[in-house]
């Protein structure tokens, strides 16, 4: 009964979704494009019979990059289709893989749209990153006997409590999933408590630890640092949300009193916020350039606004330390491991529930510092910039946490082998 109500409601609210897409398109025009894909209509043919991977957010897409590369290496003859839901996620997929994978939007969870999509792609295996439990998608895959694996699965206590209210509906949903590869024991236990069978759930660890700085990226970062700031300190604030840029800018203004040549790289989380961030910097009276301009910072440049896509790992490589946003406001924080991979200290606000386990490990190992406002942010950045040994201590411990927790990718690949043809590499 709940399935029918859910589907009927989803059809009824489609006009509201169109309005929302159109409104969001004011700041991000890409939201007004490719609507047909959201209903299973595609301009170009898709190669069937391969692997499909869905990642809803930018963070999940980034975590999936090593997995997709490993699958391409092991199964070069299988087409890989990567689906997302947002233009930002789409841009990340295209910048990471180009034409090496097929990329389209995953249709909304409507039976007819999903059937059109699955008829086109006809995957041998479907991977969903983290926790995207779409009832009609899961039902369609189950009916077609297509294996479904939730990779890098996580389930917060808050989300588990919400799902628990749906009782048998969620239990039936979970039992249609082939395998749940949980990030940790807590996540796995929550899935079992909601109705998944013990033999459906295994703990692999988090794929987010399986990132690395390639020699090519490191060399590019060194070159850019020499061009931008050969003799001045640099800090970076990334994935910032509304309400955080003003805090970062206030901290930077205070820091400039002590470090007059300090350079800030400010990277908002969403492209539609780039103009707002630029306005805030301008209103603060700070000298700035944008990354998209291609300009090189002069000695008087105080801020570089990172308004390009797909360059976050490169920009981390330029910085002496990093603040990771979504954490001073209640967004749950963003991935601190991308900064840790560069062996630089990581600062975050108190709201890190999206990365609770990772942040706890970093903080326990002295790789993460928690700040609460502009004053504490400026104070901690000042301490790190003043003392090179202190800065090195936190950076070294941050990257050690990364290395010590790697291995989830290989464990997951082994679990996927029974559902795929024999690997060729």
UniProtKB/Swiss-Prot annotation:
What's a BP term from Gene Ontology annotated to this protein? lipid A biosynthetic process
Site annotation (Transition state stabilizer): which residues? Answer: 130, 208
Q: Where would one find the signal peptide in this protein?
A: none
- Listed GO molecular functions? Kdo transferase activity; transferase activity
Disruption outcome: Cells lacking this gene display growth defects, absence of Kdo transferase activity, and accumulate massive amounts of lipid IV(A).
Localization per Swiss-Prot or TrEMBL: Cell inner membrane
Major localization class: membrane
| Active site location | 60 (proton acceptor)
Positions binding CMP in this chain are 268-269, 309-311, 335-338
The known regulators of its activity are described as: Catalytic activity is inhibited by the antibiotic polymixin B and by Re endotoxin.
Q: Kindly name one Pfam family recorded for this protein.
A: Glycos_transf_N
Please provide the record's free-text comment about the domains of this protein: The N-terminal half of KdtA is responsible for determining the number of Kdo residues that are transferred to lipid IVA.
This protein is called 3-deoxy-D-manno-octulosonic acid transferase
Native organism: Escherichia coli (strain K12)
Gene designation per UniProt: waaA
């Amino acid at each position: 009964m709940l399935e029918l109500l859910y589907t009927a409601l989803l059809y009824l609210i489609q006009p509201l979704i169109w309005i929302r897409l159109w409104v969001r398109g004011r700041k991000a025009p890409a939201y007004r494009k490719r609507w047909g894909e959201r209903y299973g209509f595609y301009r170009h043919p898709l190669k069937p019979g391969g692997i499909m991977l869905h990642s809803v957010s930018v963070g999940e897409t980034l975590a999936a990059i090593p997995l997709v590369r490993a699958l391409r290496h092991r199964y070069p003859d299988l087409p890989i289709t990567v689906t997302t839901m947002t233009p930002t996620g789409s841009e990340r997929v295209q910048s990471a893989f180009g034409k090496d994978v097929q990329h389209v939007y995953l249709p909304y969870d409507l039976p007819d749209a999903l059937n059109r999509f699955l008829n086109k792609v006809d995957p041998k295996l479907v991977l969903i990153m983290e926790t995207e439990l779409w009832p009609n998608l899961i039902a369609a895959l189950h009916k077609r006997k297509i294996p479904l694996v939730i990779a890098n699965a996580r389930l917060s206590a808050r989300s588990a409590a919400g799902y628990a209210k749906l009782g048998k509906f969620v239990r039936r949903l979970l039992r249609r999933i082939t395998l749940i590869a949980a990030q940790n024991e807590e996540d796995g236990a929550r899935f079992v408590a909601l109705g998944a069978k013990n033999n459906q759930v295994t703990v692999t660890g988090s794929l987010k630890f399986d990132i690395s700085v390639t020699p090519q990226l490191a060399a590019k970062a060194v070159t850019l640092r020499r061009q931008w700031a050969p003799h001045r300190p640099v800090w970076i604030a990334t994935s910032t949300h509304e309400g955080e840029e003003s805090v970062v800018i206030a901290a930077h203004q205070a820091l400039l009193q002590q470090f007059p040549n300090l350079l800030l790289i400010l990277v908002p989380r969403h492209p539609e916020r780039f103009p707002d961030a630029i306005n805030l910097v301008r209103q603060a009276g700070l000298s700035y350039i944008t990354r998209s301009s291609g300009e090189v910072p002069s000695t008087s440049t105080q801020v570089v606004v990172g308004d390009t896509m797909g360059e976050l790992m490169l920009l981390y490589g330029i910085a002496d330390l990093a603040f990771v946003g979504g954490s001073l406001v209640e967004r749950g924080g963003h991935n601190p491991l991308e900064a840790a991979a560069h062996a630089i200290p990581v600062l975050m606000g108190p709201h890190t529930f999206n990365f609770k386990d990772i942040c706890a490990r970093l903080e326990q190992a002295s790789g993460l510092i928690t700040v609460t406002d502009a004053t504490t942010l400026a104070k901690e950045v000042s301490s790190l910039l003043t003392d090179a040994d202190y800065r090195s201590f936190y950076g070294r411990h941050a990257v050690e946490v990364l290395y010590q927790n790697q291995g989830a990718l290989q464990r997951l690949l082994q679990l996927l082998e029974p559902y795929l043809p024999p690997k060729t590499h």
